[in-house]
Structure formats: C-alpha cells, structure tokens
Amino acid sequence: MRALVLEKKGELSLREIALPLDVGPDDVKIAIHTVGVCGSDVHYYTHGAIGSYVVRAPMVLGHEAAGTVVETGANVETFKAGDRVCMEPGVPNLSSRATKLGIYNVDPDVSFWATPPVHGVLAPYAVHPAAFTYKLPDNVSFAEGAMVEPFAIGMQAASRARIVPGDVAVVVGCGPIGIMIALAALAGGCSKVLISDFSAPKLKIAAQYAGIVPVNIGERSLVDAVAAATDKWGADIVFEASGSPKAFADLFDVVRPGGAVVLVGLPVEPVALNVPAAISKEVRIETVFRYANIFDRALQLIASGKVDLKPLITGTYDFADSIKAFERAAQGNPEDVKLQILLTGEKG
C-alpha cells in the first residue's frame, strides 16, 4: 500500500510499505479520506525527533484523520460499512492504571499514530479500535472531521481551565492550537479571549471570530493590553500555547489574583517559571497533554454549529502532492493555519 513515509530527518517519500490491516474482532477498517498536517508531523520531518520520541526507522506520518468504514470486526455493532467517521489517534492500554483513572492520555503505554515507532495514517486504509472511532454527523464534512483532533486539544485546555461563564481569557500564541483553545474557551463560556502573537496574518485569521481580540505583541505589550481590557485586574485564565521560553516570563503578570494558568505549548527545553509570582497571587497552574474523554464532545460542538473550523483550513492537497504539503508546512507561512491532504481515489 502506498503511503507518505518519513524515511529519516528531512526525507519524505511516497512509496509502497507494508502496514498492519488485519481487522480484529473489535476493530474497524477505514478508507482514509482526509488527513490534516499537524505541527508534530512537521517537527518529525524537520528535526527527526520530539523529545524522547526519535524516528529510528521509516514511519508513516499523519494522525488527524477522517474517512469511511469499509469493514467491521465480529464484535462491532455500532458501525457498518459506509459510515463516515473520525478517529481518536491515541489508543491506551485499557487495563492500565491511568486508563482506569480516566486519564488515558498520560498512559505510558498509549499507542499514538505517527509517534515513533507507531505508523500514522497517510495511507489509503487504516485499522482502528471501534471504541476510539466516532461517527460524523451528516452536517460535518470529512475536512471538519479531520479537525476534531486538534480541536480536542483546545477542548481539553478549556476543560482543565474550569471556565466560569463570563471569564476573560488570554491565549499566548496564535498558531493552530492557540486558535482552537480560544474557540473552545468561548464555547465554554468565556466572554472574550485576547490572543497574542507577533504574526499579523495569523492574528487577522483569529480576529474574524466574534469574541476573539487580537494583540500584536510586536506593537503592544500583552501586559498593557490585558490591563486595559480588565481594568488592571488581570485575566481569569491564561493559556500558554506557544511553547516559547520567552512567553513564560509574563504569564503571572497578566493573570488575576486567584486566576489560572494553563500550560499547553510544549517547550523543547526546560524553562524558568516565576514561582514566587505565582504563589503571591495564589495562581492555579494546570497542564495539558493531548486529551482524554473529550473527542466526542469536540465533535458534538462542531456539529452544533457553535464552532466553525472551516476558515482555518488554508490549503488542501491531493495525496500525490503530499510531500509538497509538508514542504509548505515546514516553511511556516504566516497565512497558513491548517493544511490538509485528500486521499480520495487511492486504492492502496
């Protein structure tokens, strides 16, 4: 079966590769339709590793996906051939302590698509547990279905924040995940969300959503912008979504006393944190790693029409041009939010 393979750092190829396609009793086989290009996919392409996860052998990329069920296992009663679906890419050990606690996203044994050594799904077909597969409502397109995965991260962040209706939030970093967090925070009850970045094009994209206030920190300090928006009280919630070490310096200057800081962006190296400032304000600190028990909620919110992710899809490529999609993503064009790859017509 032909797939997009990361051979090693900086080298991609479209080639035949043997992938596991045996359908177990609790599995579904899916004809992949749309796959999003994630920042982690690009990082593996450009750097060959993310932390301790190192590409040591050829690996198929892609984990943000939607498609159509073509075969079901003997025990599967909730799906049938022809069902349109999206898939949660992380499958934990269902007997693990983390899973039993409901925090399967931090299960050390989780198997996550396109995370070494596990193959991703930029290929015509994939087999996946039915328990981590979700039907797409009729009004949700394949393109939107492939956006559920990154939006679930935003939903996890909003959930960890414990939003109270009317809260004012700040999102540091206007990348794809930052915008997802802002939209999830608004859907969760925030009255407005300030989102900061140096990139005017990205801020312009975010600003098209009602309730999102862009702050260009190349022109104005975030501290001043938040002070003006909150009568110098500070934001109820601050989401750090950039992963930039410099961003951590101001976090406790923009959060209100008794507020919350939610860390989502993953720095490459350890960063300094102003613990005395956090303690003096009694700030609650939360962290986010992927998501758990929230994929279906993210899908339901998209289906409700309360969150429209379609404007964030800034480029679509045929599977034959998927290397070009990754080359474009690696350039970091400021006008791009989410690129997607279509596998329609591929038959293996």
Curated annotation (Swiss-Prot):
One of its GO terms (molecular function) is D-xylulose reductase activity. Binds 1 zinc ion per subunit. InterPro entries: ADH-like_C, ADH-like_N, ADH_Zn_CS, GroES-like_sf, NAD(P)-bd_dom_sf, PKS_ER, SDH-like. Keywords: Metal-binding, NAD, Oxidoreductase, Zinc. It is an enzyme of class 1 (oxidoreductase). Belongs to the zinc-containing alcohol dehydrogenase family. This is Putative D-xylulose reductase. It comes from Mesorhizobium japonicum (strain LMG 29417 / CECT 9101 / MAFF 303099) (Mesorhizobium loti (strain MAFF 303099)).
